[in-house]
Amino acid sequence: MTRSLRKGPFVASHLAKKVDAAVASNSNNIIKTWSRSSTILPTMVGLTIAVYNGKQHVPVYVSDQMVGHKLGEFSPTRTFRSHVKSDKKARR
Protein backbone atom coordinates (compact mmCIF):
# COMPACT_ATOMS: atom_id res chain seq x y z
CA MET A 1 0.00 0.00 0.00
CA THR A 2 1.47 3.33 -1.00
CA ARG A 3 1.58 6.47 1.07
CA SER A 4 -1.26 8.96 0.71
CA LEU A 5 -0.54 11.84 -1.67
CA ARG A 6 -2.15 14.17 0.85
CA LYS A 7 0.60 13.39 3.37
CA GLY A 8 3.57 13.65 1.01
CA PRO A 9 6.88 11.78 1.26
CA PHE A 10 8.47 11.13 4.65
CA VAL A 11 11.83 12.75 5.34
CA ALA A 12 13.23 13.00 8.87
CA SER A 13 13.38 16.65 9.94
CA HIS A 14 17.02 16.50 11.05
CA LEU A 15 18.02 14.99 7.70
CA ALA A 16 16.06 17.62 5.76
CA LYS A 17 17.89 20.38 7.65
CA LYS A 18 21.29 18.83 6.85
CA VAL A 19 20.38 18.41 3.17
CA ASP A 20 19.15 22.01 2.89
CA ALA A 21 22.35 23.28 4.52
CA ALA A 22 24.52 21.18 2.18
CA VAL A 23 22.65 22.40 -0.90
CA ALA A 24 22.79 26.04 0.25
CA SER A 25 26.54 25.93 0.95
CA ASN A 26 27.20 23.80 -2.17
CA SER A 27 29.39 21.43 -0.13
CA ASN A 28 29.98 17.80 -0.95
CA ASN A 29 30.64 16.56 2.58
CA ILE A 30 29.18 13.20 3.54
CA ILE A 31 25.94 13.49 5.53
CA LYS A 32 25.57 10.81 8.23
CA THR A 33 22.08 9.56 9.03
CA TRP A 34 20.34 6.76 10.86
CA SER A 35 17.03 7.44 9.11
CA ARG A 36 16.68 4.51 6.70
CA SER A 37 12.98 5.18 6.21
CA SER A 38 13.43 8.64 4.71
CA THR A 39 12.41 9.07 1.08
CA ILE A 40 14.96 10.38 -1.42
CA LEU A 41 13.87 13.76 -2.78
CA PRO A 42 15.07 15.57 -5.92
CA THR A 43 16.97 18.06 -3.72
CA MET A 44 19.23 15.21 -2.52
CA VAL A 45 20.52 14.35 -6.01
CA GLY A 46 24.29 14.71 -6.19
CA LEU A 47 24.86 14.39 -2.43
CA THR A 48 26.57 11.52 -0.64
CA ILE A 49 24.59 10.28 2.35
CA ALA A 50 26.06 7.72 4.76
CA VAL A 51 23.18 5.44 5.82
CA TYR A 52 23.55 3.31 8.96
CA ASN A 53 23.01 -0.42 8.41
CA GLY A 54 23.22 -1.52 12.05
CA LYS A 55 27.00 -1.84 12.08
CA GLN A 56 28.50 0.98 10.03
CA HIS A 57 27.55 3.92 7.83
CA VAL A 58 27.41 2.92 4.15
CA PRO A 59 28.04 5.86 1.79
CA VAL A 60 25.32 6.21 -0.85
CA TYR A 61 25.76 8.61 -3.77
CA VAL A 62 22.27 9.79 -4.72
CA SER A 63 21.50 9.78 -8.45
CA ASP A 64 18.33 10.86 -10.22
CA GLN A 65 17.10 7.26 -10.68
CA MET A 66 16.92 6.88 -6.86
CA VAL A 67 14.31 9.63 -6.36
CA GLY A 68 11.21 8.22 -4.67
CA HIS A 69 12.99 5.25 -3.09
CA LYS A 70 13.94 4.92 0.57
CA LEU A 71 17.51 5.42 1.81
CA GLY A 72 17.52 2.00 3.49
CA GLU A 73 17.11 0.24 0.14
CA PHE A 74 20.69 1.12 -0.77
CA SER A 75 22.29 0.07 2.52
CA PRO A 76 21.94 -3.71 2.99
CA THR A 77 21.71 -4.91 6.59
CA ARG A 78 22.47 -8.58 6.04
CA THR A 79 25.63 -10.05 4.56
CA PHE A 80 25.32 -13.24 2.55
CA ARG A 81 27.71 -15.96 3.68
CA SER A 82 28.02 -18.40 0.80
CA HIS A 83 26.90 -21.96 1.35
CA VAL A 84 29.73 -24.12 2.55
CA LYS A 85 31.00 -26.99 0.48
CA SER A 86 29.40 -30.28 1.56
CA ASP A 87 32.60 -31.72 2.92
CA LYS A 88 32.80 -33.82 6.07
CA LYS A 89 36.01 -32.08 7.12
CA ALA A 90 34.33 -28.68 6.94
CA ARG A 91 31.62 -29.77 9.40
CA ARG A 92 34.10 -30.71 12.14
UniProtKB/Swiss-Prot annotation:
Record-given protein name: Small ribosomal subunit protein uS19c
This protein's record includes keyword Ribonucleoprotein: yes
Keyword Lyase applies: no
Main location: plastid
Lineage of origin: Eukaryota, Cryptophyceae, Pyrenomonadales, Pyrenomonadaceae, Rhodomonas
Alphabetized InterPro entries for the sequence: Ribosomal_uS19, Ribosomal_uS19_bac-type, Ribosomal_uS19_CS, Ribosomal_uS19_SF
Similarity comment text for this entry: Belongs to the universal ribosomal protein uS19 family.
Pfam families hit by this protein: Ribosomal_S19
SUPFAM superfamilies, sorted: Ribosomal protein S19
Free-text function comment from the UniProt entry: Protein S19 forms a complex with S13 that binds strongly to the 16S ribosomal RNA.
Disulfide bridge partners, by residue number: none
PROSITE patterns linked to this entry: RIBOSOMAL_S19 (PS00323)
Single GO MF annotation: structural constituent of ribosome
Cellular component aspect of the GO annotation: chloroplast; mitochondrial small ribosomal subunit
Keywords: Chloroplast, Plastid, Ribonucleoprotein, Ribosomal protein, RNA-binding, rRNA-binding
Cellular location(s): Plastid, Chloroplast
BP GO annotations: ribosomal small subunit assembly; translation
Domain of life: Eukaryota
